[in-house]
Amino acid sequence: MILLISDLHLEQERPDITRAFLALLAGRARTAEALYILGDFFEAWIGDDAMSPFQRSICQALRELSDSGTRIFLMHGNRDFMLGKGFCKAAGCTLLSDPSVVQLNGEPVLLMHGDSLCTRDEGYMRMRRYLRHPLTLFILRHLPLSTRHKLARKLRNESRAQTRMKANDIVDVTPDEVPRIMQQFGVRTLVHGHTHRPAIHKLQIGDQSAKRIVLGDWDRQGWVLQVDEQGMNLGSFDFVPETVALLN
């Protein structure tokens, strides 16, 4: 069994999400071969040298899962692209490049966070290229912590405001970009997050059937894609104690 999740946006202000995630780690994830986290794991990340006690507790929980035998793979999102090797080493997880092709049930599957598919949002794509540039990352990592905190708050507030103002199709994936990148990597299955629009989309690429699985965000409920001998099942659960207990 392999589990895939994304867009938890973990932060101390949302203990309900944290409880649900920790229940997943202590339960179903313990029997999984691997856990893939496809970006926006944290609501914000300003550097491995600036871990808060809350973030350290999450790191320790991941380490315990890793030590139990479950492999953990972590991909950058647009909120936590500064996660680095230091965190991954401490958490016992492997940093996964975006995009990456992995074998799931013997089939090559393309994994992405999903923000790079939203090419119609030209302003965001420009900002993404700037923030992910190695020189920008070097500068950001060497800014004082207070400056990084202020910058992170500013970027989050601007992102939320701009998203509310943009048309729905602009902040969703570009339809033509999906088959293009799937053909580029030679896959018939794509799994991504970012858009907060969980669904399984069927599509046609040439003469072959294909599918795009969109993971949900953990805001009002949690979402997990489970891959096993039965196939790929995208499911959700509520953040109530009775439902969270079922994750065990």
From Swiss-Prot:
Amino acids binding Mn(2+) 2: D40, N78, H113, H194
Binding, Mn(2+) 1: D7, H9, D40, H196
EC number: 3.6.1.54
Reactions accelerated catalytically: UDP-2-N,3-O-bis[(3R)-3-hydroxytetradecanoyl]-alpha-D-glucosamine + H2O = 2-N,3-O-bis[(3R)-3-hydroxytetradecanoyl]-alpha-D-glucosaminyl 1-phosphate + UMP + 2 H(+)
SUPFAM superfamilies linked to this entry: Metallo-dependent phosphatases
Molecular-function GO terms, alphabetical: manganese ion binding; UDP-2,3-diacylglucosamine hydrolase activity
Annotated binding of substrate, by residue: N78, R79, D121, S159, T163, K166, H194
HAMAP family, sorted: LpxH
Chain's role: Hydrolyzes the pyrophosphate bond of UDP-2,3-diacylglucosamine to yield 2,3-diacylglucosamine 1-phosphate (lipid X) and UMP by catalyzing the attack of water at the alpha-P atom. Involved in the biosynthesis of lipid A, a phosphorylated glycolipid that anchors the lipopolysaccharide to the outer membrane of the cell.
Name of this protein: UDP-2,3-diacylglucosamine hydrolase
Lineage: Bacteria, Pseudomonadati, Pseudomonadota, Gammaproteobacteria, Pseudomonadales
